[in-house]
Curated annotation (Swiss-Prot):
Its EC number is 4.3.3.6, 3.5.1.2. CDD domains: GATase1_PB (cd01749). One of its GO terms (molecular function) is pyridoxal 5'-phosphate synthase (glutamine hydrolysing) activity. It catalyses: aldehydo-D-ribose 5-phosphate + D-glyceraldehyde 3-phosphate + L-glutamine = pyridoxal 5'-phosphate + L-glutamate + phosphate + 3 H2O + H(+); L-glutamine + H2O = L-glutamate + NH4(+). Pathway: Cofactor biosynthesis; pyridoxal 5'-phosphate biosynthesis. L-glutamine binds at G46, E47, S48, R107, I136, R137. Gene3D superfamilies: 3.40.50.880. The keyword Chaperone does not apply. Catalyzes the hydrolysis of glutamine to glutamate and ammonia as part of the biosynthesis of pyridoxal 5'-phosphate. The resulting ammonia molecule is channeled to the active site of PdxS. In the presence of PdxS, forms a dodecamer of heterodimers. Only shows activity in the heterodimer. Coiled coil: none annotated. This is Pyridoxal 5'-phosphate synthase subunit PdxT.
Length: 195
């Protein structure tokens, strides 16, 4: 089983390191040719405009969409959540999301870099201990479709983690937390996928 981390831009090394703590075979993905051999793909945080443009330039958007429809697990963190969304309200100039998840996501919902914060969250599917979530220019989920399961919310009710079948999206950066439980959760999703 091989898990790919999209390595076009953003926090991909940190995801690779976190997967390494679990003994998972993790590879950097920069070309569409490497996608079919994967059991799962992580789209990391970074700059959503840049990531979506590079997905198009490198011819990866359509193959990723096709694999998602076949059931391959795909996990978007922060900017990766934006990439997976069907709808992005407001000014989204330059951002072309993959449109895979039935969610409406607002970019930079918590403000600028200086407004970054950490929060301890209860997360459905993880054990009872709270998860240390790191929010950096994070998006939030404004609306979910019928088939979308809400995994976590901030204390004020803001949705920050969702799952829709084989697709997982979270607002924050678990790769920066020092806690590998979210990565373990995704590895379990990937184990169920038959390429």
């Amino acid at each position: 089983m091989k898990i790919g981390v999209l390595a076009l831009q953003g926090a991909f090394r940190e995801h690779l390191n976190m997967l390494g703590t679990l003994g998972a075979e993790a590879v950097e993905v920069r070309k569409a040719e490497g996608l079919p051999e994967l059991s799962g793909l992580i789209i990391p945080g970074g700059e959503s405009t840049t990531i979506t443009k590079l997905l198009d330039i490198f011819g990866m958007a359509e193959p990723i969409k096709a694999l998602a429809k076949k059931g391959m697990p795909i996990w978007g963190t922060c900017a990766g959540m934006i990439c997976l969304a069907k709808e992005l309200p407001g000014d989204i100039s330059g951002v072309k999301p993959l449109g895979l998840m039935d969610i409406t996501v607002r970019r930079n919902a918590f403000g600028r870099q200086v407004n970054s914060f950490e929060a301890m969250l209860k997360v459905k599917g993880l054990d009872e201990a709270d998860f240390p979530a790191v929010f950096i220019r994070a998006p939030l989920v404004e609306k979910t479709g019928k088939g979308v399961e809400i995994l976590s919310k901030l204390p004020d009710g803001t949705i920050v983690a969702v799952r829709e079948n084989n697709l997982l999206a979270i607002s924050f950066h678990p790769e920066l937390s020092g806690d590998n439980r979210f990565h373990r959760y995704f590895v379990q999703m990937a184990k169920t996928y038959k390429a």
